[in-house]
């Protein structure tokens, strides 16, 4: 029962991590306008994401534009776009592997095979968490580097957006959920002795006949 509860908790955490990763990848809030120096009061705020950039006016009106060229993006955003998509696909693959080995499904009958599939899904979720963490940390490093670079104009400096925090949360949930699934895998060596004991218990003991059960003609 404890193992089943840990599996359910692990899958719930990984699903929450996958949803956070999807929202982080879709929202255009990886980089936001930095309010420093003379730009404390501005008429518009710029949001930059993986797929589009948005400009929010002081009146509340927002205009978004999809990037025309992939090569025009900064290097960190190009890598983040590719790694985020790969991480989401890897997490989906891990979910399919888990469903094949879950205790509530009948895709695989043997308990050892189910345990191996659950362990594999946990490893896949951990890989997905690492793939999610890399672009988020890379983009955050680029933002902080440019923010403290005196050669970058204040109007071009950016701050950490909400998508980065969602990405960190997604990575943590995927790593934690995958780790729980890996810990629920039972050791296969404990099932061997019980298997042989059951085999020996099925054999019936031999019954010896008493002297009175033999035919009397053998003594004539």
Swiss-Prot record:
Residues modified to Phosphoserine: 201, 203, 208, 212
Spans through the membrane: 8-28, 82-102, 117-137, 161-181
Top-rank taxon, per record: Eukaryota
Gene3D superfamilies listed in its UniProt record: 1.20.140.150
MF terms in GO: identical protein binding; structural molecule activity; virus receptor activity
Cited Pfam families: PMP22_Claudin
Tissues expressed in: Expressed in the liver, in peripheral blood mononuclear cells and hepatocarcinoma cell lines.
Record's subunit section: Directly interacts with TJP1/ZO-1, TJP2/ZO-2 and TJP3/ZO-3. Interacts with CLDN1, CD81 and OCLN.
Protein name in the entry: Claudin-6
UniProt gene name: CLDN6
